[in-house]
Amino acid sequence: MADKKIRIGINGFGRIGRLVARVVLQRDDVELVAVNDPFITTEYMTYMFKYDSVHGQWKHHELKVKDDKTLLFGEKPVTVFGIRNPEDIPWGEAGADFVVESTGVFTDKDKAAAHLKGGAKKVVISAPSKDAPMFVVGVNEHEYKSDLDIVSNASCTTNCLAPLAKVINDRFGIVEGLMTTVHSITATQKTVDGPSMKDWRGGRAASFNIIPSSTGAAKAVGKVLPSLNGKLTGMSFRVPTVDVSVVDLTVRLEKAATYDEIKKAIKEESEGKMKGILGYTEDDVVSTDFVGDNRSSIFDAKAGIALSDKFVKLVSWYDNEWGYSSRVVDLIVHMSKA
C-alpha cells in the first residue's frame, strides 16, 4: 500500500512559493492542498503559476479556476486563501500538515508560529531565520528532531556553500575562508534607481549594474556545521542575470592537497553520500546551463584554481530558485519521516 502523501500548504506565492508548488506537483510523495496570498486574486495566481520567464510555461496539468477559493490542477483541487494574518489561515481545515512560509516577512520563530494556530503541524521558513533552527539537506538534516515545529531551510547560497564546505572540511580541514557569491537579481531589487534606505547600493538599477551586497550565507554555514563557526564569512555581487548564481569559495587548508586531489574528493562525494545535492562537472559551462538544475551546488572543476597546496579557490554553481525550492520539499519529506 502506498504511504499517505505529505500534505503541503504554501504561504506567499512569490518566486519561491510558485516554484515550490511546481516541485510539489511533479512529485508523487507530496501533495499541494492550499495556497495563501492576500495580494493576488485566484485568477492572477493561475496566470503567475502558468507563465514563468525563467523556467518556462507549466505543461504538466491543465490549470483552471474552479471558483474564487479553488484552483484545479488537472482534476486536483487546491484551496486558495487571501488572508493577511497568518494565524487566521485555516490550514487545518484545508488538510495542510506542513506550511512553507515563503512571504519573506514571517521569518522568525514567533511570527512563523502563527501558522500553528490555524492547524498546521510544522512550518518550514524558506529563508534564513535569526532564531529558528536551520537545516541544509545533505549537510545537517539528520539533526532534525520531531519535536521541532518551526525550522528554516537557510538561504539558497548557504545551500550551495555548505555541501562544498563540508566536503572540503571533512577531507582536508578548513583553516579559514572567504566566500563571494555572484548572484542573480532577486525581487527586492529595483528596475531603475529607486529609494532603498537600508541598502543604498541595493536601490540602484538591477539590470545595469554589478552591485556589491552583504550576505549572511557564509556565516550561516557555521550554524549548520558548528566546526566551521567563525571560520567563514562572505559577500555578494548582484549581477544582471535573472537566475543561477555562482559561489567562489577561497580557503586555506589544514592538510596539503593538490587541486586534482580536491577535485577527486568532490567527485567521489557527488557520486556517493551527496548525490543529488552536490554535483560535479568538467564541462565548459556558463550560468544558463544550470537553469532548472535541482541540485544545491554543482562544482565547476575547470573554473577553480590553486595558488599552493594549502590555498585554493573553488567554484560552484546553483540555480538559486529551482535548486532551493527542491530542497524545501526534500526537507519536508525528511521531517515527515522523523
UniProtKB/Swiss-Prot annotation:
Coiled coil, from the record: none
A Gene Ontology BP annotation from the UniProt entry: positive regulation of DNA-templated transcription
PTM annotation (S-nitrosocysteine): residues: C156, C160
Site (Activates thiol group during catalysis): H183
CDD domains: GAPDH_I_C, GAPDH_I_N
Pfam families, A to Z: Gp_dh_C, Gp_dh_N
Regions crossing the membrane: none
InterPro entries assigned: GlycerAld/Erythrose_P_DH (IPR020831), GlycerAld_3-P_DH_AS (IPR020830), GlycerAld_3-P_DH_cat (IPR020829), GlycerAld_3-P_DH_NAD(P)-bd (IPR020828), Glyceraldehyde-3-P_DH_1 (IPR006424), NAD(P)-bd_dom_sf (IPR036291)
Null mutant phenotype: The double mutant gapc1 gapc2 has an impaired ability to enhance heat tolerance of seedlings and to promote the expression of heat-inducible genes.
Effect in UniProt of substituting K255A: In GAPCmut'; impaired DPB3-1/NF-YC10 binding, but normal heat-induced nuclear translocation and impaired ability to enhance heat tolerance
Binding site for D-glyceraldehyde 3-phosphate: S155, C156, T157, T186, T215, G216, R238
Activity control summary: Inhibition by oxidized glutathione (GSSG), S-nitrosoglutathione (GSNO) and hydrogen peroxide.
GO molecular function: copper ion binding; DNA binding; glyceraldehyde-3-phosphate dehydrogenase (NAD+) (phosphorylating) activity; NAD binding; NADP binding; salicylic acid binding; zinc ion binding
Residues with the S-glutathionyl cysteine modification: C156
Cell compartment(s), UniProt: Cytoplasm; Nucleus
Catalytic activity: D-glyceraldehyde 3-phosphate + phosphate + NAD(+) = (2R)-3-phospho-glyceroyl phosphate + NADH + H(+)
Protein name: Glyceraldehyde-3-phosphate dehydrogenase GAPC2, cytosolic
UniProt gene name: GAPC2
